[in-house]
Swiss-Prot record:
Location of the protein in the cell: Membrane
InterPro entries registered for this protein in UniProt: Cys-rich_flank_reg_C, Ig-like_dom, Ig-like_dom_sf, Ig-like_fold, Ig_I-set, Ig_sub, Ig_sub2, Leu-rich_rpt
Gene Ontology cellular component annotations, sorted alphabetically: extracellular matrix; extracellular space; membrane
Residues making up the signal peptide according to the UniProt record: 1-28
Cell inner membrane listed as a keyword: no
LRR repeats: 61-82, 85-106, 109-130, 133-154, 157-178, 181-202, 210-231, 253-274, 277-298, 301-322, 325-346
Gene assigned in the entry: LINGO4
Annotated disulfide bonds: C435-C484
Record carries keyword Membrane: yes
Protein name: Leucine-rich repeat and immunoglobulin-like domain-containing nogo receptor-interacting protein 4
Amino acid sequence: MDAATAPKQAWPPWPPLLFLLLLPGGSGGSCPAVCDCTSQPQAVLCGHRQLEAVPGGLPLDTELLDLSGNRLWGLQQGMLSRLSLLQELDLSYNQLSTLEPGAFHGLQSLLTLRLQGNRLRIMGPGVFSGLSALTLLDLRLNQIVLFLDGAFGELGSLQKLEVGDNHLVFVAPGAFAGLAKLSTLTLERCNLSTVPGLALARLPALVALRLRELDIGRLPAGALRGLGQLKELEIHLWPSLEALDPGSLVGLNLSSLAITRCNLSSVPFQALYHLSFLRVLDLSQNPISAIPARRLSPLVRLQELRLSGACLTSIAAHAFHGLTAFHLLDVADNALQTLEETAFPSPDKLVTLRLSGNPLTCDCRLLWLLRLRRHLDFGMSPPACAGPHHVQGKSLKEFSDILPPGHFTCKPALIRKSGPRWVIAEEGGHAVFSCSGDGDPAPTVSWMRPHGAWLGRAGRVRVLEDGTLEIRSVQLRDRGAYVCVVSNVAGNDSLRTWLEVIQVEPPNGTLSDPNITVPGIPGPFFLDSRGVAMVLAVGFLPFLTSVTLCFGLIALWSKGKGRVKHHMTFDFVAPRPSGDKNSGGNRVTAKLF
């Protein structure tokens, strides 16, 4: 058989990736055929190339390696150890399920490692050994269930850790041990049921903590104790969080606090009192209905308050009392009908005011906004009037400096309807005083006691929602003059009403209430002054008769004994002195009483 007719050797087709892996690499070597390379910086871009293994022949001076969006399933020990100058490695959106200990050995210059969008399940010790210079680690969108003790112990330079969108249910107390420089930690969209306080306490340099979209219903007292350097805390989308424990933020020295899209029904004043360095407070999208007066005053350095998208219906006068540095308020998209100037300690210092999306009534209470409208930053949507009807829908910036008659005016409060001026009630009975008024804006109704104290909405003597004064179980001390005061921002009016209490005399000489009885048990019986005199007379006469009779019998017995002797003589024998042989009888006479 000649060479021309001899059968050719059939070589099996080699996979192209195998050739890539066999290509030699050296300093400044050629770029792998399946990748794109740049020189400034020294980057090898192999993303979204359907790769199932790391290509060979990577230049040794590579500073950025992008392997994202491929089909890599694992990293073996030492696979990238020759890339000692590598600073950024992107392995995101592959199929990595395991990382062998030492997989990143030799990457002592690596600063950024992106592993999001893989299938990693457990982070154990030794996985990140050799990454002594790493500053950013992104583990989002994996299937991580738990962090074991020492999982990040080799990352002494790590500053930012992202671990959101995992199945995380447990963080061991020592999981973050060794992260001495970690400054930013984000835990979001996990299955944690409690805040891992013991693990967080191992982060002495933590500055920013973000806890987002967690099904945690309580932040217990001391949960974040030990984070003395923490400045920014964000709690976002905890639908089960209805309140903060008073000691939940103890030990923190925050400058920014955001608790948004939770279920807080009121501002957590008790938990905030000690945060004297707080500058930014964001409570947006919580069902908070009011900001009361003077409750924020302990936050002396507060500059910004955001409470947009809540349920605010009122901001009280002096609500921001004591906040001398306050300059930004965002209360957009609420149910506020007004915002009075007296809420602010210095309205002229206000720089930014977000007030759009509120049903504002444009009356005299908003004149101060007209005065400052050219200097205030209202954002993209300036506030607009929802009433009265002749200005409805008109933006505050559309009004001229000279207002037409009837614009932005108020009507003083006047009492229009009241009950009788003199009310008589029996002791133990029920008394009601009615009082209401007219005005624009609608006035509030208050009542004052006879001794000058204002009455509240609870107790035996209380003011009802419609302004009616109710006194239950009337007592003698309730008598006197009660003053009804109706007031609004334009003025006030008052009316005095008297209450006279009739003391109820108990029947049959008793002071007890005959209507209050217990079946089968006789009630207490009390005597009046006449009854007491009769009892004393009945008891004293028999006693006096008995004493007189006794003395009479004694006198008769004494008379029957004859003449009364007043002296008596007694004979006695005295001791005889020695030598005295002539001793006669001795006698002594005693006087009888």
